[in-house]
């Protein structure tokens, strides 16, 4: 839960002379004491508002004011910052923060292999570092040990969690109004998809390929993942839900048994092609292959828990239920 605590110092003016005037009159003949000169009170300057928020790790984070020099350690955080108008407050990023285009101009101080250039971070003098669930805990502790304020943004379990992350960053950056506007817009778009899908009479079986390096055992997303949630929210059934872990390999034999009606390729950026997948041994019997329902998909839309998750939902809905969106071009 977010709290913005604004402490202001109240001005207290001592009125000793006024109170003294209510005392007993001076004795007759007694010398009249000289009046003390009045000294005008100097108003105190109130301190800057204190920004306070609780991060995903349960840590209460306090800033003297909205962060102005931010380092982001995850693409999702970077996209959230730019989406609420706080991109200009960033001074550093991880190497995978490549969206929007303006983010690429920022110095990269962390790699996707979990390596962090602490010297580069120190040189940037950030007043806030945004970590993520993928950030190694020892890195978070190292940064805090160096005196930096680190806010951990966890992966959302649902859309409400996504909206909460938007609002958290709005609080920390002084962009609360913009963040609320973005959260409302995302919520409205998710609602619109749900309303459109309310007339769906089927829930097609969907296989989403994360990595087909071993085509006999491609990696996919299992139960309890945000991708699983997105597929279901888009009116489909995730065939990976039969797995026992969130991310795992699934055998070709199991895929044939599941018989996906739609195959989405999240690994086309790494060379996987529709033609190559269609020619895989044993895959020709799948409904998706026979009906040519194999589609490339921008994995960044569903693997980065940022504002473009809703773009991913809209695109998934169109691919899974094209009959419901045939006359519309808004998604």
Locate each region found by the language model.
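Short secondary-structure boundary segments
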Residues: 74, 133-134, 210, 243, ...
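Bacterial Sec-exported substrate-binding components of ABC uptake systems
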Residues: 2-14, 20-78, 177-209, 319-331
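Proline-aspartate-enriched helix->loop->beta-strand connector
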Residues: 67, 117-134, 251-268
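His/Asp/Glu-enriched short active-site or ligand-binding loop at hydrolase and phosphoryl-transfer sites
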Residues: 221-247, 267, 296
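Extracytoplasmic substrate-binding proteins
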Residues: 60, 138-214, 240, 292-331
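Short helix-initiation/N-cap motifs at beta->coil->alpha
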Residues: 56-58, 109-118, 156, 243-252
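A ligand-binding cleft/hinge motif common to bilobed small-molecule-binding domains
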Residues: 135-145, 262-280
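A short, structured surface patch at a secondary-structure boundary
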Residues: 69-124, 128-133, 139, 239
């Amino acid at each position: 839960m977010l709290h913005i605590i604004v402490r202001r110092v109240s001005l207290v003016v001592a009125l000793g002379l006024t109170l003294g005037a209510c005392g007993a009159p001076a004795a007759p003949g007694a010398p009249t004491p000289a009046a003390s000169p009045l000294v005008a009170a100097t108003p105190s300057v109130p301190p800057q508002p204190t920004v306070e928020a609780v991060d995903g790790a349960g840590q209460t984070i306090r800033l003297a004011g909205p962060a102005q020099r931010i380092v982001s350690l995850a693409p999702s955080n970077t996209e959230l910052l730019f989406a609420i108008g706080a991109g200009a407050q960033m001074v550093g990023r991880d190497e995978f923060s490549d969206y929007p285009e303006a983010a690429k101009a920022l110095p990269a101080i962390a790699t996707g292999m979990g390596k962090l250039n602490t010297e580069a971070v120190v040189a940037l003098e950030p007043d806030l570092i945004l970590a993520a669930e993928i950030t190694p805990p020892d890195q978070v502790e190292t940064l805090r040990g160096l005196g930096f304020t680190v806010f951990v943004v966890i992966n959302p379990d649902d859309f409400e969690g996504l909206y909460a992350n938007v609002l958290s960053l709005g609080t920390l950056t002084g962009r609360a109004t913009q963040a609320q506007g973005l959260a409302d817009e995302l919520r409205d778009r998710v609602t619109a998809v749900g309303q459109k899908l309310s007339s769906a009479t089927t829930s097609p079986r969907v296989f989403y390929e994360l990595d087909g390096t071993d085509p006999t055992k491609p990696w996919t997303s299992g139960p309890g993942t945000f991708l699983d949630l997105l597929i279901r929210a888009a009116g489909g059934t995730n065939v990976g839900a039969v797995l026992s872990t969130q991310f795992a390999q699934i055998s070709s034999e199991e895929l044939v048994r599941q018989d996906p009606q739609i195959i989405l390729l999240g690994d086309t950026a790494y060379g996987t092609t529709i033609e190559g997948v269609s020619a895989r041994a044993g895959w020709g019997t799948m409904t998706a292959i026979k009906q040519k329902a194999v589609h490339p998909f921008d994995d960044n839309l569903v693997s980065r828990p940022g504002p473009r998750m809703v773009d991913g939902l809209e695109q998934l809905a169109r691919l899974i239920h094209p009959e419901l969106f045939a006359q519309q071009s808004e998604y």
